[in-house]
């Protein structure tokens, strides 16, 4: 009997390596693919295992594949990564917004471009090392994404863009394990990456200095005015891409009081600063909505909502608005609701969906 073929996205890290091992143990025909999505150059080799696209990472993935006895290939996805992730990342900062590149990569590269490539070579599924639980719910009549067993490793926030087709064709076996269990499995299989450290947050910025990256990639960054809450000029900023809502440190301004970034105005190249209470808000409007648990949103819905990757969820009312937008009104104030970031909605363990924050404001009365 022919085995079901699964393509595993192998980064050379522990999670994707254990994903491949578990699926192989379960009887699948596993093919490892490492996605070459960014050319980090020679600098990456000095960073070793911290970057996903270095020769070290590719070699680690190959060594794991050899240990498991599976095929392994390196495929070039640089063009679509440049377009959908790098260009998006820089353009959003130039617009005074704070992007989330992992969401864009998952949405357009891993679960679209890689899935299409996998299906074209006869695979029925792709698999990744994300910590989430995928399945089908008879109650909802939908393919679903649920929070993982290990809540500390929960990655559902960056998966809200997945479609029904993508969820149906994707496996995430680590959703049922804790990180400690995953490392133990890696040791039990004798995988050469069992003790490897976690990868960095933004894979294409090797030194974690996104300001340096933007200076090199983006043209037209200019200094401009810092304004107080009355609209008066109180200083100069170095360029709006270098700041984000809620930021206090690194403003370079001696004001005699603690000031925070309250608003970024790209049209006037201005940044408004104010006291901490000014960065708290209850309501937001979001666009580019993707729903997983429901086909559509016809009426207000009580949800748990999350405005940043590491933030806690908070009770909120989700409201459909014209032109495909949604409004979110939190029951309690939230800190630093930031345009460009994602707001993601949950019902219990189930991921309802998410959207991109456009603005804050009291739309909800």
From Swiss-Prot:
Q: In this UniProt entry, which cysteines form S-S bonds?
A: 105-203
Compartments annotated for it: namely: Cytoplasm
Keyword vocabulary terms for this entry: ATP-binding, Cytoplasm, Disulfide bond, Nucleotide-binding, RNA-binding, Transferase, tRNA processing, tRNA-binding
List, in alphabetical order, the Gene Ontology terms for molecular function in this entry: ATP binding; tRNA binding; tRNA-uridine 2-sulfurtransferase activity
Q: Which GO terms describe its cellular component?
A: cytoplasm
Q: What is its EC number?
A: 2.8.1.13
Carries keyword RNA-binding? yes
- Broadest EC class? transferase
GO BP of this protein: tRNA wobble position uridine thiolation
Segments of this protein annotated with the region Interaction with tRNA: 153-155, 308-309
> Which residues does the entry assign to the active site, renumbered to this chain?
105, 203
* Residues with site note (Interaction with tRNA): 130, 341
Binding residues annotated for ATP, in chain numbering = 9-16, 35, 129
**Catalytic activity reported:** S-sulfanyl-L-cysteinyl-[protein] + uridine(34) in tRNA + AH2 + ATP = 2-thiouridine(34) in tRNA + L-cysteinyl-[protein] + A + AMP + diphosphate + H(+)
Q: Which family does it belong to?
A: Belongs to the MnmA/TRMU family.
Q: Which NCBIfam families does the entry link to?
A: PRK00143.1, trmU
Q: Which HAMAP family match?
A: tRNA_thiouridyl_MnmA (MF_00144)
What does this gene product do? Answer: Catalyzes the 2-thiolation of uridine at the wobble position (U34) of tRNA, leading to the formation of s(2)U34.
Q: What is this protein called?
A: tRNA-specific 2-thiouridylase MnmA
